[in-house]
């Protein structure tokens, strides 16, 4: 499978499927999006074909299986903008589709730069996502929610997974989440103090119960400056709002989603 793309693309697809646990549908989208982008870039950069001369038939006939990593290293931000310009002018892609293709490129180049260490410079760092209509929904789909959860890793994986699980399932405000104390959870019910100091009770489904149990099992016990707080920062204090905002943005980007579109506020409406 995927024999018509270079080995580093195959490796990326394998990484996204086996390590990041992306769905088969998402892997196929990555494959088609990256294959199309590399075919265009070969025609445009190597074959020196003018933008207005490139058509779908030429793309379909272009062989990229032997493109070496040196070609990838030569790709610039401007080359990628030319590709987006081509999509906008020659394809029927809507902004949402182009946005998905940008996300695929960002994930691919992030992988080559930070995981494989094959690139010294990532040309997608400043690549902007096509602006989406304000009428588009601002909540995550099921696949996007799963992608976000699968992106969580690192030293605080259990804590961060628990935080995002609660955001996705409980409709918590950021202020409510950081204010949760250990004693606020009893018999699978979470009690929070919301706007206007109004107390409300939230039933915790199994996903939340499992995430909380997994986090509490590794939650720091020694040297805490706030023993009541459920979520503890690296310094042993109650986790702050800004820390959560930065953390959520980080995982949104790693999931290939648009951080300008999603935030803790948007997660609570999912």
Residue map of PLM features:
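Conserved catalytic core of the tyrosine transesterase superfamily
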Residues: 1-270
